[in-house]
Amino acid sequence: MRYIIKLFPEIMIKGAAVKKKMTRQLADNLKRIFAADGLPPNVKWFLDKLEVEVPDDQVHQAEAILLNTPGIEQVLRVQQFKVEPTLQAVAERVFEVVAPRIAGKTFVVRAKRKGQHGFNSQELERWVGGYLNQNAAATGVDLHNPQVRIELELENNTLSIVEARLKGLGGFPLGSQGAVLSLVSGGFDSTVASFLSMRRGLKTHFIFFNLGGTAHEIGVQQVSYYLWRRFGRSHRVKFIAIPFEGVVEQLLTRISDSYMGVMLKRLMLMAAEQVADELGVDALVTGESVAQVSSQTLRNLALIDAATDKLVLRPLATMDKPEI
């Protein structure tokens, strides 16, 4: 089975050099994951897309990888042919493939064309649609509400007939935007924040401040591993656990309860900054959202941030709890 990988739109508006770098990064990421899973790493990259070919018996495995890899906007499952680049030759090949699919149904043809041809995309649509309407057992053409939508892409003499269009994860290729260290607790907010940083192309390491014993640490490690395994395993990352029970005990004896939340988070950022320096990481990620709890007012967040010279990213900062 062959796939055409459409890139995230924000990649497509970059300059040629940046676009090339990101496309190459995405191809390398896919090759690593495919190889790790025992799939042939048949990935070709172009400036505006990727093409992937996998054995038919590994389609489900391949699609699971493609749909969970940052940087991919759409995955097109296609049948691909070399054709004479004429209207008649294209129409005849399309008829061979789609005639059974449109029998007894209304249809529409949508085409994209790239390369040197003596016709444009609209002319290609009209010609193929007319040929199918005359020769297939369809009930007719319906431009607005068809039962079957036939999608074609013609690039020079390569014809791709789209079987399915699948929604990808979006974002930037992992590793293309640097690395961050995410403060994780095992809760929903920090998990979502970590996912969003990965989807944005940030290689995401994990740091956990243990306040509740071994069982809690194991649970957080499992959540972090799940995130990495599903969305980020093209890159190796670190999971760092820091025992913080003693710190909490000291705080309980030295400060009032009203300052506890802010002070604890300041100390966590100070410790995380040291780890980030060792990893060569430029920013920290947290799952905080403005005003969700008392320690997350703007004033308190500013006090917390003052404890570190690192940039602190908060992907959930303006999101409501139901959105998260």
Where in the sequence are the language-model features?
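RNA-binding accessory domains that recognize and position tRNA/RNA substrates
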Residues: 1-181, 191-237, 306
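Aromatic/hydrophobic pocket-lining residues that form π-stacking "cages" and hydrophobic walls in ligand
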Residues: 220, 224, 272, 324
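Cofactor-binding loop segments of dinucleotide-utilizing enzymes, especially the Rossmann-like FAD-
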Residues: 185, 209-211, 244
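Active-site adenylate/phosphate-handling loop in enzymes that bind or generate adenylated species
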Residues: 130-132, 165, 171-177, 248, ...
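A glycine-rich phosphate-binding loop feature that marks nucleotide/adenosyl-phosphate handling sites
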Residues: 48, 241-244, 289
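S-adenosyl-L-methionine
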Residues: 229-256
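A short acidic, often aromatic-flanked loop/helix-cap motif at beta-alpha or helix-coil junctions
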Residues: 81-86, 149, 246-249, 320-323
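Structural beta-sheet core signal
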Residues: 182, 206-208, 241, 286, ...
